Structure formats: structure tokens, C-alpha cells
């Protein structure tokens, strides 16, 4: 198999988070444009079935009976021909070789499975027992199913995936447009010191919505393989800066810890991530995830940013200097009021950098106000 035709080997699972990562790696390994996917499509078109284990170790070898050892380079045509045999196929862990063919796989029969067909039940049990992905090609149902540590994914053709991906991309464009609007409003309110918890929650809500739809599209990109290159470029352009902005908003507004309530930036981000779709639509729930009480009175209460988000927009300003400026001045309003001399009192800020920060903040303030009122 040519190196440029072969995706990265998926490896083995390791826990729930590992299973999710293995599923993505496995989808990439069988995506359109790879030799493995080409071979699977040939098997499907040839009206034959197949059971392919994507990896090998002592556990896999111990459950193999019959068949024969090959240890030959993987090619799509070889896979097609070997699937004509009545038995499973075992590939090397890097998917570069066909190790065994025509084998009968005997996984632990007590492993629970909801599959009905013999081939699919075996594939599900093998993937659960050995941790390697297993592909089952159904002759009667004419489908390719991927089993990864208890998860099952039916591989679709590119046209069906692209149709859903384009719908999701159109949704992302609308979400991003709305995010830009509320983020611009927040910037103007920050300059005027008129921000409420409601304003912050609205921006955090939109950032999370954009991030989630982008994650969904990223899954489509993985499934599409070479057919998803244009989609990947569009996605990268739309979500540029969204993840850093999400963290900056939380750093700016996560409440100061108190005796009754405290939440770190990482904890707030994790709480936002755990919100269900219905919960994300409620600003009060978003506010609680950020660390506020979420009551109607709290939503309308005033808050002031620390200044991380606006300082990050100043060109060529290192993160370490931003942290020192925020720590020294304690809030955005004091930063906006600081003179060049005041800024120079911060460690690492010389006259040139102080002037750059002063001019950068002034330009941001002017543009934010103009965008809101003009």
C-alpha cells in the first residue's frame, strides 16, 4: 500500500475518551481516498461479504483458528480476492500488511451484543474483546459497518455525507454571523462599562453553539477523507479564533471566588461543554455554568471585564504581558484610563510596547463604538 494512500493506523481503545479518539482514527483509516476504503468498496461491489480486523496482537492470534498466514503487503485487490474465502482477515496494526486470511474468529461468546447477523455479532464481540477496530461488510444488506469498542458506525457514500455536511455548514455560517453581532455588541458595552451578565451569557452561548456545530462538521470531514478537503478549508476559515475567544470570554468574566461559590476557568469551560442543547438555549443556565447564580436579577446585574479579550486584539502583544497587565490594573476600565507612563510600570513593558498598547486600545475603543452606533 502506498504511503500517501494509507491513513494513520487507528490503534487500540483505552477507556471512553480513548474509544471516541479511536473511532475518529478508524473513520480516517477507512475514509474515501484510502486503499482500505477502496478495497472495502470492491468487496461490496463484488457481492461478497467480509470481516476484517484492523490490527493484530497475541489476543487476536489466540482467537484465530483455521485459515492461513500470509504476511503480504496490503492492496485493495488482494483484500477483494481474499474476502471471497469463507473467513475473516487480519491486518497488521499499521494496516500495511495482510497477516491472515480465511480464519475463523472465536471471540468470547458471553460478551453482550445487540447485533443479529453472525458476521456482525462476531465483529462486535471481537472489537470489544481485543480493542482493535473491526469492519464487517454485509453481502445481503450491502453495507459496510465499523465496530470500535462497542460503537457501531455504518459507512456512507460521500454524496450522502456531503449533503448533511453542507446543511451543517450553512447553519454554522448563520451561527457565526450572529456570534459576530453579539461579540461586537459586547466589545462596545465593555468600552462603555455597561456589560451585564446577560450580555456575557449571550456571547458564551453563541460561542458554544458555534463550537458544537463545528465539531459535528469536523466529524464529516474525517468521514469524507479526500472528498472533504474543500469542506475542511471552509470550516477552518469560519471558526478561526473561536476557541481562543471562548476561553478569553470566560477568563474575563468568571466570578471571583467566594466562600460559597468558586469556579476556575477550566471548570467553567467544562460546565459549558456539559450543557445539553436544551440547557444551552437558556441564558440563565449558561450563566450558572460560568459561575453566576442564574436568577433573573443576576442576569441584569452589571459586571466588568478583566481585559484579557480586548488586550488579545492588540497586535504583537505576548500572552505573558497580557497576564501582567491584567494582574497589575485589575480591570479593563483602568487599562483604558492608563497612560503610557502608567503602562510602563508593568514588568516587561517598555516605552515602545506601552505606546503600542495605548494606541491599540484606543483604536479598538473607537471602532467598537462606531460599529455599534453608526
From Swiss-Prot:
Query: Record's superkingdom?
Result: Bacteria
State the Gene Ontology BP annotations. DNA repair
Q: Which cofactor does it need?
A: Mg(2+)
What residue ranges carry the coiled-coil annotation?
A: none
Q: Please provide, alphabetically and separated by semicolons, the GO molecular function terms listed in this UniProt record.
A: adenylate cyclase activity; ATP binding; catalytic activity, acting on DNA; diadenylate cyclase activity; DNA binding; hydrolase activity
Q: Which cysteines are joined by disulfide bonds?
A: none
Entry keywords, A to Z:
ATP-binding, DNA damage, DNA repair, DNA-binding, Magnesium, Nucleotide-binding, Nucleotidyltransferase, Transferase
Please verify whether the record's keywords include ATP-binding: yes
Summarizing activity control, the record says: Diadenylate cyclase activity is inhibited by the interaction with RadA.
* EC numbers: 2.7.7.85
State the family named in the UniProt similarity comment for this chain. Answer: Belongs to the DisA family.
Q: How does it assemble?
A: Homooctamer. Interacts with RadA.
Protein name, please?
DNA integrity scanning protein DisA
